[in-house]
Design a protein with these regions (language model features):
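Multi-pass alpha-helical membrane architecture of UbiA-family
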Residues: 1-224
Length: 224
C-alpha cells in the first residue's frame, strides 16, 4: 500500500508546496511529472518483487496462505518481471532527465542490496527498509528544484522545511510498521537466521522502541 501513498504525497506536494503558483489541473496534466510519478510506482513495485524473491523461505513459515499463492508464480518469473520493471523505470527516468535517471538507478541498486544483504541485520535493516520506502517521494524534488538557479534556493527554504517535516513523519510511521512486522515474523526470522531487533534484543525492548517512536511522531507534527 506504499504505492498509492507515495503517488498521493508526490502530487499533493507538487500542488500545495512545490508549485502553488500553478493551477492544480496543470500539475496533474504535466506529462513529465506523470512519468516521474509512474516511474516511482514501478520502482517500488520492483522492490516488492525482489524482496518477495529473497523472502520466499521465510514466508512459508510467517505467511503460509500467501506462500501458497506465491508458489503459483515461479522464482524465474519473478526475476523476469523484476528486470523488466527496472528497465522500464530506467527508460522513463531518462526521458525526464539524467538526474532522475541516476536517482532511480541508485534506488534500484540499493533496494536490491537491502533485500539481498542488509535486511537480515538488526536496526540498520529497519532503518534502511524505511528509508527505501520513503525515498521515491524525493524524486519530485529533482523535478522542481533542479530548475531553480542556485542563488534562488534560499527563497525555497520554507517549502523544503515543510517537505522534510512531512517526510520525517512518514519515515517514523513506516519505521514503526517495520518494527511491528519484525514482531509478527519472529518464527520465520528465527528459522532463517535473520538478526532482527526482537531476536537479538528481545520482544520487550522492541515494544519499548515502538512506544518511543510513536511518541517521536509528535515532533514533526508540532513543527508543521
Amino acid at each position: 500500500y506504499n504505492i498509492p501513498v507515495i503517488i498521493l504525497a508526490q502530487y499533493l506536494s507538487a500542488i500545495f508546496i512545490l508549485a502553488p503558483e500553478k493551477r492544480a489541473l496543470d500539475i496533474v496534466l504535466d506529462f513529465n511529472l506523470f512519468i516521474l510519478v509512474f516511474a516511482s510506482s514501478l520502482a517500488i513495485a520492483s522492490g516488492y518483487i525482489i524482496n518477495n524473491f529473497y523472502d520466499s523461505k521465510k514466508d512459508l513459515i510467517n505467511r503460509p496462505n500467501k506462500s501458497m499463492l506465491d508458489r503459483l508464480v515461479s522464482q524465474k518469473t519473478k526475476l523476469n518481471v523484476y528486470f523488466t520493471l527496472n528497465f522500464i523505470v530506467a527508460l522513463m527516468a531518462l526521458f525526464v532527465s539524467w538526474r532522475v535517471f541516476l536517482f532511480f538507478s541508485s534506488y534500484i541498486f540499493f533496494i536490491w542490496f537491502y533485500s539481498h544483504k542488509i535486511k537480515k541485520y538488526p536496526i540498520i535493516g529497519n532503518l534502511t527498509a524505511t528509508l527505501l520506502a520513503v525515498l521515491p517521494f524525493f524524486a519530485i524534488l529533482l523535478y522542481y528544484y533542479t530548475r531553480i538557479p542556485f542563488e534562488d534556493i534560499e527563497n525555497y527554504k520554507r517549502q523544503l522545511g515543510v517537505i522534510f517535516s512531512h517526510a520525517t513523519f512518514l519515515y517514523l510511521l513506516l519505521l514503526i510498521r517495520e518494527m511491528i512486522k519484525d514482531l509478527e515474523n519472529l518464527k520465520g526470522d528465527l528459522a532463517n537466521d535473520y538478526k532482527t531487533i526482537p531476536i537479538v534484543y528481545g520482544e520487550e525492548i522492541s515494544k519499548k522502541i515502538i512506544t518511543t517512536l510513536t511518541i517521536l511522531t509528535v515532533f514533526p507534527v508540532y513543527v508543521l
